[in-house]
């Protein structure tokens, strides 16, 4: 019997963003110091500073009481450039 421990390889953040771009995965982006707003859309470009270009972007208000997104009140933004400094989290919207 072997005592080898299985370890998972670390995935660099840039690779994760690149996968979202390649697969055209809808994403939700949480903003730094803007807990009442999230951005949904598709990543169509990014750079080494994690600035991202989002297409079909929608600004979604978040209820401060329960943290739920109010998608019906979303504001369409179209194509936007979001600076990496403003991004707290990027996750799949699926």
Curated annotation (Swiss-Prot):
Tell where it localizes. Cytoplasm; Nucleus
Alphabetical GO CC annotations of the entry are: commitment complex; cytoplasm; nucleus; pICln-Sm protein complex; precatalytic spliceosome; spliceosomal complex; U1 snRNP; U2 snRNP
Keyword Signal among UniProt keywords: no
What GO terms in the biological process aspect are recorded for it? Answer: 7-methylguanosine cap hypermethylation; mRNA 5'-splice site recognition; mRNA splicing, via spliceosome; spliceosomal complex assembly; spliceosomal snRNP assembly; U2-type prespliceosome assembly
Keywords assigned by UniProt, alphabetized: Cytoplasm, mRNA processing, mRNA splicing, Nucleus, Ribonucleoprotein, RNA-binding, Spliceosome
Which Gene3D superfamilies does the UniProt entry name for this protein? 2.30.30.100
Chief localization = cytoplasm
- Per the UniProt record, one Pfam family is LSM
Which residues does UniProt call coiled coil?
A: none
**Molecular functions per Gene Ontology:** RNA binding; splicing factor binding
Q: Where does the Sm domain start and stop, copy by copy?
A: 14-94
Q: From which domain of life does this come?
A: Eukaryota
Which family, according to the similarity comment? Answer: Belongs to the snRNP Sm proteins family.
Protein purpose: Involved in pre-mRNA splicing. Binds and is required for the stability of snRNA U1, U2, U4 and U5 which contain a highly conserved structural motif called the Sm binding site. Involved in cap modification.
Give the quaternary structure: Component of the Sm core complex, present in spliceosomal snRNP U1, U2, U4/U6 and U5. The core complex contains SMB1, SMD1, SMD2, SMD3, SME1, SMX3 and SMX2 (Sm proteins B, D1, D2, D3, E, F and G, respectively), and is probably a heptameric ring structure. SME1 specifically interacts with SMX2 and SMX3. Component of the U4/U6-U5 tri-snRNP complex composed of the U4, U6 and U5 snRNAs and at least PRP3, PRP4, PRP6, PRP8, PRP18, PRP31, PRP38, SNU13, SNU23, SNU66, SNU114, SPP381, SMB1, SMD1, SMD2, SMD3, SMX2, SMX3, LSM2, LSM3, LSM4, LSM5, LSM6, LSM7, LSM8, BRR2 and DIB1.
Fill in the misc note.
Present with 556 molecules/cell in log phase SD medium.
- Protein name, UniProt field: Small nuclear ribonucleoprotein E
Q: Which organism is it from?
A: Saccharomyces cerevisiae (strain ATCC 204508 / S288c) (Baker's yeast)
Q: Which gene encodes it?
A: SME1
């Amino acid at each position: 019997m072997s005592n080898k421990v299985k370890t998972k390889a670390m995935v660099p953040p840039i690779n994760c963003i690149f996968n979202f771009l390649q697969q055209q995965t809808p994403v939700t982006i949480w903003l730094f110091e803007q807990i009442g707003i999230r951005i949904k859309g598709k990543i169509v470009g990014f750079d080494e500073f994690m600035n991202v270009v989002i297409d079909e972007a929608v600004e979604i208000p978040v209820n401060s009481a329960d943290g739920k997104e109010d998608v019906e009140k979303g504001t369409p933004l179209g194509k936007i450039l979001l600076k990496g400094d403003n991004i707290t989290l990027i996750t799949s919207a699926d």
